[in-house]
Amino acid sequence: MSSHILQVQNLSKVFETENNRFTAVDSVNLEIHGDEFFTMLGPSGCGKTTTLRMIAGLEVITSGNILFDGQDFNKFSTFQRNIGMVFQSYALFPHLTVFENVAYGLHIRKVSKTTITELVNHILDLLVMSELASRFPPDLSGGQQQRVAIARALVYNPGMLLLDEPLANLDAKLRVQMREEIHRIQKDLGIMSIYVTHDQEEAMSVSDRLAVFNQGQLMQVGTPHQVYAKPQSLFVSDFIGQANYFPAHITNRNGSGVQVTLTKGLELELTSLVTLNKDEVGSIEPNFDGIVMVRPEHLSLSTSDSASLSCTVRRIMFLGSYTRYIVNCPDSRNEVFVDSPRPISGIEEGSKASIGIEEPDAILFHKGNS
């Protein structure tokens, strides 16, 4: 197991032109430990790749520090940082065999031929690619080319592995296979890995922890479950998974929880509270307005009028392991998504129905918006 520690401290990157100044990364703080598989997730232009490039030494830092095992990375070139990198473009040499592509970095490092042979054969065995050693990149599938790029990044035993959208050029089924392969290899080697993607399912499936970025800012860091179940902003709740939103009015403070009323009079007792204005933490009081967020699996549909919120079922989608109901509800900001592990008897497209909310899993966002 790796004992390395990467610390990113108040990291910022500003791009300046004659007429413009753009902050791509704004005061980001991160700490990544040992053999973590850590993912930086966010929409295009959010700053995740720029952060990765600064860690790699491919982008000049405007301000802040990057420390690896206490050493200031700013004092080392990309080559000296001992980092393995895999990018969206595999950048394989078409005139070199798989073996020669993997060995290329070792030749640059002036490693002996005997050691090169041992190291390359070992990494090809680990990636189950030994039989491809004499083939050329144009003769390989996309997944095989990706494995070659990974082998080349790992063969010299780097201190950390950086992966920037490495599966973007693969089809959907192969992406799933390769992300599991990357996760297996990473855990087998016990190497710290930092993975950049905009694909939330990809991030959730492979990460020990993930960081959600938006507009250059770090919005939240946590395990996939923490970020999904306890989002700390409306942006994170919307970007990670599907979310439903209901305008609410706070009517009573009750210990650590609150009582809220939705627009049609439904009362809820909630204990999961998020203050959106960080200057007002703990100041929630009656008569404030807020937004209740509920995941689709924590809603239920019923033909009974007593369930709570009235709605009309617009669309029913059977998605294999669950059935998704898309309903129109005047109490919600948008269409409401309800996920059920099995089809609900008596509910059809066009049906009138009622929505029930699982209160322990609902979150109240209050004081402003994000």
Where are these regions (language model features)?
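ABC-family P-loop ATPase nucleotide-binding domain
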Residues: 1-14, 305, 368-370
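The feature captures the beta-strand-to-loop junction immediately N-terminal to the Walker
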Residues: 41-43
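Conserved ABC transporter NBD signature motif
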Residues: 64-72
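ABC ATPase nucleotide-binding domains
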Residues: 76, 80-238
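Non-catalytic connector elements of ABC transporters
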Residues: 243, 253-370
